[in-house]
């Protein structure tokens, strides 16, 4: 977040990050990697150059988008203009053969539905607070909806959890694809 407020800092960070990612991707040639970005980072030239320079490794990289905040300098664009911009960038990344994943928590349903043709995977991270606040039946209905949507649109749907608790076990019992955080 700090880097996004200073273009110079962000530029330096992305150059450093690119070198590190290139080094790791070359060394670990048989591994698949996940790079987490916010959608707002797609507004920056440095992000696009970073991803363009990784095109040779794109089939081994998942770009996982989290959040949907808009940088202050782009707030004058309408929701539709923002959506069109992001769809264009996501299509470009898909054309470059990156695997595109989008977190659905903390963003609008409309945005996720609009981005669906550009995605390979939708992901829901179940936080401890959400588990405690949610009625298990409501949670299962929520999961069922997104699982149905993903199946209908030929996407992978992943529920990311921190540990094996009762709710996690009930999801596994339903055959939902559960991924443990940092796994």
Regions found by a protein language model. Give the residues of each.
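PAS-family sensory domains
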Residues: 14, 145-148
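Leucine-rich repeat
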Residues: 18-22, 45-51, 79-88, 107-111, ...
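Bacterial c-di-GMP phosphodiesterase EAL domain
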Residues: 1-53
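The catalytic core of metal-dependent phosphodiesterases that act on cyclic dinucleotides
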Residues: 55-134, 149-182
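Acidic-and-aromatic substrate-binding clefts and catalytic sites of carbohydrate-active enzymes
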Residues: 11-15, 37-46, 70-74, 109, ...
């Amino acid at each position: 977040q700090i880097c996004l407020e200073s273009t110079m800092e962000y530029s330096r960070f992305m150059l450093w990050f690119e070198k590190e990612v290139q080094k790791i991707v070359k060394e670990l040639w048989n591994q698949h990697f996940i790079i987490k970005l916010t959608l707002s980072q797609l507004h920056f030239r440095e992000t696009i150059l970073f991803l363009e320079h990784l095109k040779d490794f794109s089939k081994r990289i998942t770009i996982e988008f989290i959040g949907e905040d808009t940088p202050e300098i782009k707030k004058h664009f309408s929701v539709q203009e923002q959506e069109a911009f992001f769809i264009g960038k996501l299509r470009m990344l898909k054309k470059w053969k990156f695997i595109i994943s989008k977190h659905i928590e903390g963003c609008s349903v409309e945005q996720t539905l609009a981005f669906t043709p550009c995605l390979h995977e939708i992901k829901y991270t179940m936080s401890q607070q959400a588990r405690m606040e949610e009625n298990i039946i409501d949670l299962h209905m929520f999961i069922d909806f997104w699982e149905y949507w993903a199946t209908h649109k030929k996407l992978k749907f992943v529920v990311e959890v921190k540990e094996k608790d009762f709710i996690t076990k009930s999801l596994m019992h339903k055959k939902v694809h559960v991924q443990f955080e940092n796994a």
